[in-house]
């Protein structure tokens, strides 16, 4: 079935350019020219992926992304001329999955869109994600493999598909492994690493907010200076009990 992609941008020529290339791939395109129009459509109709400009009237892209990620689980790609590191970090921190800077190569944009759709929908196909157990537990943390859910003691947190893949990578190899940023990126994003450390740092920060009692003093995801990250082992918590 053809996937539905919403493009929210106040520049009609940008929408038309993306629409031209995406319709060649048989995607259904919904056009929105401000944030409120995009939000109202998504509230009433199913959308598989949203492409959002930052600078829009009525409701800007950052506000729209915050609303979307609080209420919906769909891939979000920022498409913007605001390409400072601070803009990228803010957008990814609010829940966006990718950031494409204007001007852009439409073929590269299509490839990134397809990658996000592939990840989002492959995650929901159990035959392609065979997992031997229903959950993995380390300390007070339990990752449920049948849904995007993590339990921290008695508290329940929803995680995005990307956060699930990142946390699962850590938890499946939590004994002694130190992951470089390149290894984490290629495992969780399934793409070749392009030395974008900000993307990884933002996602690690978001995960820590959900799984750590004190995110600034992490127990589970530990930074190994100069090397990368290490996840707590089950032995660490067994020792606490003795």
UniProtKB/Swiss-Prot annotation:
GO cellular component: cytosol; protein-DNA complex
Organism annotation: Aneurinibacillus migulanus
GO BP of this protein: regulation of DNA-templated transcription
DNA-binding feature ranges: 133-233
InterPro entries: CheY-like_superfamily (IPR011006), OmpR/PhoB-type_DNA-bd (IPR001867), Sig_transdc_resp-reg_C-effctor (IPR016032), Sig_transdc_resp-reg_receiver (IPR001789), WalR-like (IPR039420), WH-like_DNA-bd_sf (IPR036388)
Role of this protein: Member of the two-component regulatory system GtcS/GtcR which may act in the control of the transcription of the grs operon which encodes the multienzymes involved in the biosynthesis of the peptide antibiotic gramicidin S.
PROSITE patterns: OMPR_PHOB, RESPONSE_REGULATORY
Gene3D superfamilies referenced in this protein's UniProt entry, alphabetically: 3.40.50.2300, 6.10.250.690, Winged helix-like DNA-binding domain superfamily/Winged helix DNA-binding domain (1.10.10.10)
Protein's UniProt name: Response regulator GtcR
Sites bearing 4-aspartylphosphate, chain numbering: 53
GO terms of molecular function: phosphorelay response regulator activity; transcription cis-regulatory region binding
SUPFAM superfamilies to which the protein is assigned, alphabetical: C-terminal effector domain of the bipartite response regulators, CheY-like
Keyword tags: DNA-binding, Phosphoprotein, Transcription, Transcription regulation, Two-component regulatory system
